[in-house]
Amino acid sequence: MSEDSEEEDYSDRSISDDDDLDEDSFMKFVSDDIHPCTLLAADSIGDPFFPRTTQILLEYQLGRWVPRLRGPRDLYGVSSSGPLSPTRWPYHCEVIDEKVQHIEWTPFVPEPVYVPTGLEIEPVYPNSKEDTVVYLAEDDHLCKAYKEPCFVYSRVGGNRTSLKQPVDNCDNTLVFEARFESGNLQKVVKVADHEYELTVRPDLFTNKHTQWYYFQVTNTQAEIVYRFTIVNFTKPASLYNRGMKPLFYSEKEAKTHNIGWQRIGDQIKYYKNNLGQDGRHFFSLTWTFQFPHSQDTCYFAHCYPYTYSNLQEYLSGINSDPVRSKFCKIRVLCHTLARNMVYVLTITTPLKTSDSKRKAVILTARVHPGETNSSWIMKGFLDYILGDSSDARLLRDTFIFKVVPMLNPDGVIVGNYRCSLAGRDLNRNYTSLLKESFPSVWYTRNMINRLMEKREVILYCDLHGHSRKQNIFMYGCDGSSRSKTKGLYLQQRIFPLMLSKNCPNIFSFSACKFNVQKSKEGTGRVVMWKMGIRNSFTLEATFCGSTLGNKRGTHFGTKDLESMGYHFCDSLLDYCDPDRSKYYQCLKELEEMEKHLSSERVSDNTDTSLVEISLDVESSSRGSDSSESNDTQTYLLKVTSQARNKKKYLKTKRERNAILANCQNNMQEVYGKEHLLQRHDESNSDGNDPRIDAPDVYVAHCFRRPLPNQGVVKIPGQRFYPGKTWSSSQRMIKSLNKDHRTCILETCKNPIQEVQSRGINIHESCFKMAKCPMNKRPSHWIEKTRIPTESHHQLKSKAKRCSSFQSKRTGTNWTDDEKRIYRDKRIAQTQEILKYLLPIVESSQNRKSTQMNNLINPIANLQQHQLIPTACINRRRYSIPWTPTRNLPFKAQRNLMTDTSEWLQSVPLGSFESLLPLCNLQKKTKHFELWGKKAKDVQLATSQWEAVPLSSNMDASIIRGNSVLQPKEFTMRSSKQRIPYLTKTSKKPSESDGLLTFQLKIHRNS
């Protein structure tokens, strides 16, 4: 797991006794009067005398190359017997010799946040350049070095020139210093007797990320109100506007009262100033403060400092402990650009054999150097997992922990807020292949990849700090579809929910987010999730405090942050507990949350719930792997408006209304004043249908133009169902041939049913529809009047005139979308017609054989036949909707009565050939069956519906007595729907009549 040594290495001898020789080599490297290459590996020399190896170093001394062996690589980094590895700085950085140390201290009571009074002032210093500069981190000699485009090399102690002393004009001027580890302060200007303008240094080799400050103040005077104003912040929003106070440390207070870092300040204000340059805007932070002691050495900081030296001291203590060192192995993962060590810890109970059943847990921290709160959480985690409690032992026995406590030591040392010495954010480069530029994240990813080949990694968590939100929360990953993997969708939220239950006063589950943004694809969280780690999280800890429970309105201290490490271990035990009661309890709560919020839709996308939208918006790259949102409910409204604005805008409301009006006008031109039949379930007021098992039956009656001898007859067995309101509607019937156009029938709103029983002309027919109950035998008669319609040729011409996709009112052509909408509506109307049409059966007794021939011949029937066949449609519900073709003629199942002898004499097998083209229609949704059946087999309206198998073939059978005649085309025996036997009179035919029923049935393919 240590770094490869194939490249040129200056730092392997950094902890050896010949450290001075190493420093001299660097001085020779930058000197102009000697050879530019003073130290090379043997494999870079073309002389065959030297073997190709990386273990021999060549030094240029006295005009010749002198070989020597490379020192052994330091795999352990820390040692209980030897000194710690010294920190290495960029060669141009000035570093004071004094080592800064602080004590740890916990306030007796939680420190409250600052409550604005409204009297805070916003100081502006337009003429600060003319005032006295009391501190400047870089002078003219170092300006060129700071403007280097990239990092060059490093050395222990940084710049070796004499340090420039701070300005000390008079006795009452404060003395500032920040040239120590993790310090950050670039310039201080004294604008008044007790007022100072401060400028923090941006990250090295960048011109941004001015957020972290940490500096020293001496020559203080007690009982004097000082004002400090930092003028070059770049974030528009800050926790200082929400009550966060700066941190203060007094050495005298630490010595006399054992008090460490504490929150201080009055008149705290974060505001926009007028120092914008090149289109950039800056923000100022101002506060006032009275020092507790005179001639004191004090410190101000953005958050509790935790330096690289603090980490080394902590790891050295672990290594020197005979108990903890047994189950905690410290190794060097790699070296940074400045040749500082990146440590990796392996924590587990020693394995007697190679046990691959243990799952792995990975924790990393401090990829952003200014987020020091992540190091305090890591310290709390290590304190607990290395302790002697029973839960800690159980965790070590169950898991293998891989811990990288500080991913960016270079940035921590120089006081950066976000970047490494490469000038880049490491948490956006986990996908990079540049091992030399981003070694810590490259080797971390490689280590995890190799670990996953041996064992399962159950959880990955990267610790961060957040500068705009309160509390502690998590970011997770959820790139899968909820509808397909709902279980996984909820399982990724179980661990954060458990964490919120174990520490409800500091962890907020409502602030957690579980989405993958494109701008975050280079983060460790997303990369590890894509590598196969299901529980991949970023733990975000606020710089301020909590808004939850009894911690509400208070700042987080170091102990609060350390306690988060303990709660993390406790939640890990709950998550992997063999007793899955807590697991399923959290899963059930998540399901209830989803059900509760699923009804609240914030956009037209029905798959997006409110909780998903609130978890979708994350911040830009200026913050941590975090969000710009806050914890208030107004954020949901803001996000809701953002989600609605994401919808692509197509047309204005006026345009949409115009399109809808045009479609309605065209439909009215086609159908006249008619309307579609309402469904019976829509007209049911109470919604209780006692006929739940009975199918719906609709009876359609055909009428003709009134003749002199036409009379009115009653139809037995038809009555309205009680409690229902039935309506009649005009229906459209297509002819049997493409040459005949649509016949559109007028609407009848009269609920009384009457049937014209004698000569009926099909060209002037009108369908009347009524719904019949099937569970009770009818006992009365219902009359139905005939309503004439328009002539066939008039309706045909009207349909032709309105078939164009051009608006007659606007005179504009329709778009493709409008045409598609219009066609869809026409198809839907045709489906309604085919669904509700159900003709009745009339008696065909005493009919001539010529009439049967006319019925079989569709063209002749349309022109000559004077008796319309009453058709029966088997109304069936299909699971898959079907769409009729535009020009397919409508056909109905028909039951025709005729004498058996007449049928056999007048219907040859060749007559069926006229129907064969109907069977050969390709890609049609309807097929036909033709068969004959004796009238004695036809029962009354008490029969049940039977399913008819789908078939693309036409079968014809003639039933006579017990014999069945079938043509060769017969391929299957279709089950038949028994239709009520209806005649013009109330007389039921006897079984001796021997009438044959001719049936033509439509089959629809789903």
Curated annotation (Swiss-Prot):
It is found in: Cytoplasm, Cytosol. Residues 304-576 form the Peptidase M14 domain. The active site is at 540 (proton donor/acceptor). It catalyses: (L-glutamyl)(n+1)-gamma-L-glutamyl-L-glutamyl-[protein] + H2O = (L-glutamyl)(n)-gamma-L-glutamyl-L-glutamyl-[protein] + L-glutamate. InterPro entries: Cytosolic_carboxypeptidase (IPR050821), Pepdidase_M14_N (IPR040626), Peptidase_M14 (IPR000834). The keyword Lipoprotein does not apply. Its main location: cytoplasm. GO terms for biological process: protein side chain deglutamylation; proteolysis. GO terms for molecular function: metallocarboxypeptidase activity; zinc ion binding. Residues 790-810 are annotated as: Disordered. It is an enzyme of class 3 (hydrolase). Its cofactor is Zn(2+). Binds 1 zinc ion per subunit. Pfam families: Pepdidase_M14_N, Peptidase_M14. The keyword Hydrolase applies. Induction: Up-regulated during ciliogenesis. GO terms for cellular component: cytosol. Zn(2+) binds at residues 368, 371, 464. Its EC number is 3.4.17.-. Keywords: Carboxypeptidase, Cytoplasm, Hydrolase, Metal-binding, Metalloprotease, Protease, Zinc. Belongs to the peptidase M14 family. PANTHER family: CYTOSOLIC CARBOXYPEPTIDASE (PTHR12756), CYTOSOLIC CARBOXYPEPTIDASE 3 (PTHR12756:SF23). This is Cytosolic carboxypeptidase 3. It comes from Mus musculus (Mouse). The gene is Agbl3.
